[in-house]
């Protein structure tokens, strides 16, 4: 009997995001929460990369010479600003529909981004290495978290960074990120997140350590409904980000 090969692909997740792929660049559409969240995560990413690689954050292209992977890139909401900051960007997503949308938008924006319809494990198997890996809002959608974290960790060069953003597996997160955001406020299509697939910080930290990475920062990200904006926080009960490095 042949053993089934492990994969990070969850077919139902790919189908879900492919179905709404045309919405990626509509700031008032189904991905509105990501558009609102983007400035906060972009500021954090830029700050930490510039500090790590001794770059001037005020320079027009502070990421020049850095090779960056955005895994689970969707329509390219992070890839495009990373490219504008000077990084050599590879955007990977298991949904060919997402990649088609991302390619079209990058071409319209005059940006040179290497978009690939592929998986983390395929990239790792090919020996790809990066100065920075962005693993943002993806881990809660994959079929095999251990395989996914192993593959993404493997691609971080010595001295390189990996950013991970996801949702905690708590009752508070269930109430706010699933019931509130999907069923009450209708910010996201129903079924975007499944509670049992959410990942706790300690589980993520264990996976990073297993992959040879060292945790260097952890923070929460909270939404202010009055200001309709996101900000950094100490509260990791719902949305949170971690930053890890591979020792040089």
Curated annotation (Swiss-Prot):
One of its GO terms (biological process) is methylation. It catalyses: a 3-demethylubiquinol + S-adenosyl-L-methionine = a ubiquinol + S-adenosyl-L-homocysteine + H(+); a 3-(all-trans-polyprenyl)benzene-1,2-diol + S-adenosyl-L-methionine = a 2-methoxy-6-(all-trans-polyprenyl)phenol + S-adenosyl-L-homocysteine + H(+). Keywords: Methyltransferase, S-adenosyl-L-methionine, Transferase, Ubiquinone biosynthesis. One of its GO terms (molecular function) is 3-demethylubiquinol 3-O-methyltransferase activity. Signal peptide: none annotated. Disulfide bonds: none annotated. It is an enzyme of class 2 (transferase). Its EC number is 2.1.1.222, 2.1.1.64. S-adenosyl-L-methionine binds at residues 41, 72, 93, 136. Gene3D superfamilies: Vaccinia Virus protein VP39 (3.40.50.150). Pathway: Cofactor biosynthesis; ubiquinone biosynthesis. It comes from the Bacteria. Pfam families: Methyltransf_23. O-methyltransferase that catalyzes the 2 O-methylation steps in the ubiquinone biosynthetic pathway. Belongs to the methyltransferase superfamily. UbiG/COQ3 family. This is Ubiquinone biosynthesis O-methyltransferase. The gene is ubiG.
């Amino acid at each position: 009997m042949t053993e089934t090969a492990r994969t990070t692909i969850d077919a139902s997740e790919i189908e879900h995001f492919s179905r709404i792929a045309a919405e990626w660049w509509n700031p008032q559409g189904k991905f509105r929460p990501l558009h609102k969240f983007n400035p906060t995560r972009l500021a954090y990413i830029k700050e930490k990369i510039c500090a790590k690689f001794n770059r001037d954050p005020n320079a027009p292209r502070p990421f020049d010479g850095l090779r960056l992977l955005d895994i689970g890139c969707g329509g390219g909401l992070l890839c495009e600003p990373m490219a504008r900051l000077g990084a050599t960007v590879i955007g990977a997503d298991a949904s060919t529909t997402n990649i088609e949308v991302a390619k079209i938008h990058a071409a319209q924006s005059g940006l040179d981004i290497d978009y690939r319809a592929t998986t983390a494990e395929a990239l790792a198997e090919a020996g790809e290495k990066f100065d920075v890996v962005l693993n943002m809002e993806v881990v809660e959608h994959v079929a095999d978290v251990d395989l996914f974290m192993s593959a993404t960790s493997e691609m971080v060069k010595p001295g390189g960074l990996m950013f991970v953003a996801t949702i905690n597996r708590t009752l508070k997160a269930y109430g706010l990120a699933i019931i509130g955001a999907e069923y009450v406020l209708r910010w996201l299509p129903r079924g975007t997140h499944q509670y049992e697939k959410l990942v706790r910080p300690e589980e993520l930290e264990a996976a990073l350590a297993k992959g040879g990475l060292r945790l260097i920062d952890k923070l929460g990200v909270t939404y202010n409904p009055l200001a309709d904006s996101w900000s950094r926080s100490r509260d990791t009960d719902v949305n949170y980000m971690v930053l890890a490095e591979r020792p040089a």
